[in-house]
């Protein structure tokens, strides 16, 4: 949820975000979500609140979005990301953690609402990620399967309205 404590700052004509996302894998599928109007999928998560640890952010966001108590494990990626979305330019720093969702008993699609935004959650086969639009686009089957230690990733500017 975007509140007064959220680290999302308008600066110099753009918006700086500090974001955390989770990589949940189950039965060779990865959990992704999107809004009904987006043409791309992304990892679930949200913005960090001031004085909040990033692991706690992911726990809070998963509870807010899904009602599920996630277990946050390894930090996989630290990502510097520049993109345009919804008529704004973003500079985003993101922490991406592996997470376990023990309360999910099925891999059925489900919906949630976060800050008046509808979200569709879907378990996508990891081997078929290349068939859908995933953003950030470094998220591939190889990146997920070949995780050995935390990596720093820098992404070039991308306009999400034209992907």
Regions found by a protein language model. Give the residues of each.
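Conserved Nudix-box catalytic region and its N-terminal flanking loop in Nudix hydrolases
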Residues: 26-64
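Short connector loops at helix/strand junctions that flank enzyme active sites
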Residues: 17, 25, 38, 43, ...
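Unchanged
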Residues: 48-71, 81-135
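Residues embedded in well-ordered beta-strands
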Residues: 21-23, 29-30, 94-98
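Nudix hydrolase/Nudix homology domain
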Residues: 36-41, 106, 113-163
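Short, solvent-exposed loop/turn segments at secondary-structure junctions
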Residues: 14, 40-41, 79-84
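Acidic, metal-coordinating catalytic segment for phosphate/diphosphate chemistry
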Residues: 1-21
């Amino acid at each position: 949820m975007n509140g007064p404590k959220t680290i999302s700052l308008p600066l110099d004509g753009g918006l700086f975000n500090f974001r955390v996302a989770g990589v949940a894998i189950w039965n060779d599928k990865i959990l992704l979500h999107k809004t009904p109007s987006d043409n791309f999928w992304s990892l679930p998560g949200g913005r960090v609140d001031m004085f909040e640890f990033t692991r706690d952010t992911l726990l809070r966001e998963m509870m807010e979005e899904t009602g599920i108590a996630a277990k946050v494990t390894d930090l996989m990626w630290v990502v510097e990301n520049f993109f345009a979305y919804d008529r704004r330019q973003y500079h985003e720093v993101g922490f991406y953690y592996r997470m376990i969702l023990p309360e999910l008993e099925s891999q059925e699609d489900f919906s949630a609402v976060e800050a008046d935004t509808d979200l569709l959650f879907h378990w996508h086969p990891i081997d078929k990620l290349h068939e859908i639009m995933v953003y950030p686009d470094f998220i591939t089957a190889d990146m997920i399967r070949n995780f050995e230690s935390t990596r720093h990733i820098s992404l070039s500017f991308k306009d999400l309205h034209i992907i």
